[in-house]
């Protein structure tokens, strides 16, 4: 009963979009597709119309025709929920999954038959996930515990794949010089992807799913809490006081495609001595954001507003073309202050008359420290290289005053200082200041 009452809203959205393009189609379609190919096809029926068209002789038999049949699929799942376990506590959950693929096939038409020649599938995949078990694991430009775990996971995943294929691991002849099962070397994509995923999400390599695609999305969350205002000490000090925490992560596969060599002979080894994989993947990406890790938003009894927050995020990407891992890490610390001075007035003379202008003066100040760096890690050599990064101090001050309901003025001062992580870039300081006058026409 308590669980049912705390759930305020649940949303489920599933969208599937399919499309086909069949070039070389000759007959007239008739009014609204009532002739050919068929009325169900006009309304989205996605059965293999190309074979029916070939059987009925609807396709061109021009010798130099080389356009491709294309079939596209886009499947998107969105799940949302809003929970309120207590009056002062709100939790919002959100998870997503998206799968996109495009099948392209070269063909020719012979009398009464559609003849497929070469087919290739390309696509992208993204799903919300969770990496919080490794979020605070030691990692810098010199070393990374998760990266070392990734390298250690490869032998575990390789042995699981070999056992799944029925390879006798007790026979030394079935192992390569590094101790990996033959066909599942340390640089095989089928080995690298689960090992990478397990290491950076904190999962056990013995139990992680061996396939590249993940089935069910893990929700991101945003938590807001204002219950401290119930305490007498907080009531006496603050007009409002709230805490916010947010987290989200995602797992993505970019630019996967059909392995045409696998289609020819699935059991043949490639030049590196590995079994061929059904699909070839370019990059695997894990993205994590604490947005924010913690945020304090308060207003004191004297009208002073205070905001402080810490943000962290990281992006880990492995290139399966060269087996390099790229890690981007960001940290941001921000403090904001605001104060309103009420009813500041001064006299002005307008059109021969003395006019008293009275309005509030709003003051805002923000200061932030932001650090980020990008490291490329080599799986074969102990060689970590910082390729980009900087430490930045940011400051901003504004003061705005409304002279009337149409006219307002803003004074601003912006300051930034950046020191770069690589020696070829010089430190940079930027200062911007000025006055903005804004008039609104009714």
Sequence positions of predicted segments:
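Exposed, low-structure sequence patches enriched in small/polar residues
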Residues: 1-442
């Amino acid at each position: 009963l308590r669980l049912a009452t705390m759930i305020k809203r649940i949303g489920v959205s599933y969208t599937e979009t399919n499309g086909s393009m069949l070039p070389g189609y000759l007959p007239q379609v008739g009014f609204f597709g009532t002739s050919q190919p068929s009325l169900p096809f006009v309304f989205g029926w996605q059965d293999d119309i190309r074979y029916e068209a070939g059987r009925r002789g609807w396709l061109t038999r021009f010798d130099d025709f080389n356009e491709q049949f294309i079939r596209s699929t886009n499947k998107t799942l969105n799940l949302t929920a809003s929970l309120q376990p207590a009056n002062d506590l709100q939790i919002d959950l959100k998870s997503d999954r998206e799968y996109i693929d495009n099948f392209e096939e070269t063909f020719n038409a012979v009398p009464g038959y559609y003849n497929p020649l070469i087919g290739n599938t390309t696509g992208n995949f993204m799903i919300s996930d969770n990496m919080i078990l490794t979020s605070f694991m030691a990692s810098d430009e010199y070393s990374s515990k998760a990266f070392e775990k990734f390298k250690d996971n490869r032998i575990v995943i390789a042995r699981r794949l070999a056992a799944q294929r029925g390879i006798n691991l007790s026979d030394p002849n079935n192992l390569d010089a590094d101790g990996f099962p033959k066909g599942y070397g340390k640089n095989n994509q089928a080995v690298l992807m689960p090992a990478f995923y397990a290491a950076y999400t904190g999962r056990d390599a013995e139990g992680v799913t061996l396939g590249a695609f993940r089935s069910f999305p893990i929700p991101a969350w945003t938590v807001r809490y204002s219950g401290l205002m119930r305490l007498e000490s907080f009531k006496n000090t603050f007009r409002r006081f709230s805490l916010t925490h947010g987290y989200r992560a995602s797992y993505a596969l970019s630019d996967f495609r059909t392995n045409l060599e696998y289609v020819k002979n699935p059991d043949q080894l490639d030049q590196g001595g590995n079994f061929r994989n059904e699909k070839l993947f370019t990059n695997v990406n894990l993205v994590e954001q604490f947005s924010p890790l913690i945020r304090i938003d308060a207003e004191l009894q004297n009208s002073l507003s205070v905001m402080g927050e810490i943000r962290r995020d990281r992006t880990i990407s492995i290139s399966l073309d060269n087996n390099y891992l790229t890690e981007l890490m960001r940290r941001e610390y921000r403090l904001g202050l605001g104060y309103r001075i009420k009813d500041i007035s001064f006299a002005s003379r307008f059109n021969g008359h003395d006019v008293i202008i009275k309005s509030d003066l709003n003051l805002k100040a923000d200061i932030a420290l932001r650090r980020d760096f990008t490291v490329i890690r080599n799986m074969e050599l102990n060689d970590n290289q910082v390729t980009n990064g900087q430490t930045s101090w940011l400051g901003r001050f504004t003061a705005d005053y409304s002279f009337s309901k149409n006219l307002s003025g803003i004074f601003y001062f912006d300051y930034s200082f950046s020191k770069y992580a690589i020696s070829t870039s010089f430190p940079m300081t930027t200062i911007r200041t000025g006055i903005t006058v804004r008039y609104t026409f009714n």
